[in-house]
Amino acid sequence: MKKILSILLALALMLGATFALAEGNVTIAVQGMNDFNDYIQSMVVYGDRLLLSSWDRLYTWDNATRKLTEVEGYGELESTLTGDDETPGVLDLNDGDYAYLDGNLYIVGGRLYRMATVTDSDGNASNQLVELLIADDGALSLGEVIDLGDALCITESDGDQTYSYTRSLSNPCSFGNTLYALSYGDELELLALNLEDETVETLTLDVDGDVQSIAPYTEGKLLMIVNNYDADPVTTTLCLYDIENEEAAELGALPTADYDTPNGISYDEARGKLYYVLSGSVWRMDVTEDGLGEPEEFGDMPLGYASGNGVVYGDLYVLADSDAKEIPAKSRFF
């Protein structure tokens, strides 16, 4: 059920609000953009750019105009991936292979990637991370290919037929040449994708509750939102996960509102603060390895739910939301 829900939420990302991080009450810098009708699946800060991607479109945020600008050529990258009768593609495909790129963006080792899935004529899948290059003039092309084989694939049987599909990666973040993400197999797992070795490792995930999301903290450490659904009402703990030791330590309890729990988390190392959304408000909190500061409510959140994590981009905290039906068309943003 959780796996299905995560896919539905990814397809539903449509609205957003951008919040200034200055001291005092929050100010909504942007909420909505007329006539915008796309479903944002991924947001990343890449160099000095804020990039947002849907299944077949790439957008960049323009601080001067306060608008999203579509990057030309994104939808044609699959042709570059597979090639045609006259031009070879980036991937070396066999007859009967089918390949496509998903709508997510990943940053590892300062490079930008997309995930390609290749399915052969027997229904067996494999994956490659393909570098996305953006030239100074905005032209897009594909670069190096990281072959992950079938390490991200789940195989199922239907009678005499077997088929495989790619598991989704939630809250992807990286340190060095390794990408970390939550992913459902038979259960929720924390995966480490080493691009140098082209390997995928499952890390130990031993916490008292259910991990809801992860976010990068400092080098080699992740923040984890952990909910305890056995409590009534539910309780939420912020944990610090040490990647090298594969251990999680509790930093402290996060506030909840009945069954509403924190979401849209993003940690800003420069400010030493965690930003999140809870019950119609935006919150911030000091975080150190010794514990948590007092949560501070610093603005109203006009959207009902932030799907996925937020991102900090300079002085802005950017969120995406799925409550399109509750927001007037004139306020639509992404």
What are these regions (language model features)?
Residues A22-Y59, A64-R66:
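An edge-strand/N-cap motif at the start of beta-rich repeat modules
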Residues N37-V44, V90-I107, C153-S157, S164-C173, ...:
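Repeated scaffold domains used in trafficking and secretory/extracellular systems
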Residues L52, R114, A181, M224-V226, ...:
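Residue position within the beta-strands of beta-propeller blades
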Residues R57-T60, S121-E131, E187-L191, A231-C239, ...:
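Structural motif
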Residues D62-R66, I134-G138, N194-E198, D242-E246, ...:
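Short loop/turn segments that connect beta-strands within beta-propeller blades
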